[in-house]
C-alpha cells in the first residue's frame, strides 16, 4: 500500500515492521502494535528500544485487535499469510489513530519492489486494504466493549489425593 507523503510530495510505500515484546515473566514473544503512528520507534532509525507495554483503553482499538490479528487467522479473511493480517490490522489501528479510513489514505502499489511485480503487489495489496477497511469500520461501529475477565470459582469440599495413570495428584472440585 502507498500513502501520500506530504513532506516529500510523493506517494511512498507503507513499511510495516512486525514488532513484538518479550514478556519478562515467561520470556515469550508477543506481538505489539503501536497505536501512535507519529511516534518514532522500530523502523524509523532505531534498532530496538525499551518501552513500557501498556493497555490502551479504547474500545475501538480493542475491537480491531480482537477481530483482526489477535482474534482471527489470515485464512478466515482470505489473505495469503499471517504477515498480511498483521499488516491489515496495523493499517486499521493507524487509521483509527489518525481519523482517516484506510481506503481514503492508501492506494494500491504502483511500482515493483523487492522483486515483486506491480500485478502481484496490487493483487495482495487489494486484499490487505479491504481487510484493513473492514477492521477499521468494525472498530468504529462495533458494539462490543472490553471487560476485564472475571472468574467466580467456589471450592466444593476438601481436596483429595488421587492416583491417575500411576501419578499422585491433588484434586479439588469447584463450582
Where are these regions (language model features)?
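Short, surface-exposed polybasic-aromatic patches that bind anionic ligands, especially phosphate groups
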Residues: 1-173
